[in-house]
Amino acid sequence: VVNRGNKSLETLRFIYSLKENANMVLGNHDFHLLVCALTSKKPNLKDTFTDILRSPDRYTLIEYLLSRPLILELQDALLVHAGIPPQWNTSDALHNAKLVHQKLQGNDTGQFLTKMFGIIDSSLNTWYKPSYWSDELSEEEKCRYTINALMRMRFCKENGELEFKHKMHVN
């Protein structure tokens, strides 16, 4: 919803104003806004959501985004921003999305976001790891994989490895 043009604030306010007449899932840009709003991470030079961070209603808008799900269950479909790994069934996807959503609703949201994006030591590049799903992953790793799968991945290999680099059309 945000960071895809120069009207991020207007767009977010519009969707918020629709209340129960509209629903949305969190996407990677919305999540990036939350990270910048609730941690020490600064927006990138190209980010177009700094007006949200300075707006008088920023707390309301940030709380609204925090309340948005990572996945919507529709009658015969699931709606996500990026994708669902092939190892997950519907129950797995809903369960893992709920785990992340609960963390976003918790008392330590800023700390959770910091752990998810490796802000403490960015040289570790932890934000994209793990790239594979395993039931043996720690809760933190499961959350990071879930965020990356549902909101960030470009492609997913048959074995479940997430791919983030490709940004061009597939030929």
Regions found by a protein language model. Name each.
Residues 5-137:
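Active-site neighborhood of divalent metal-dependent phosphoester bond hydrolases
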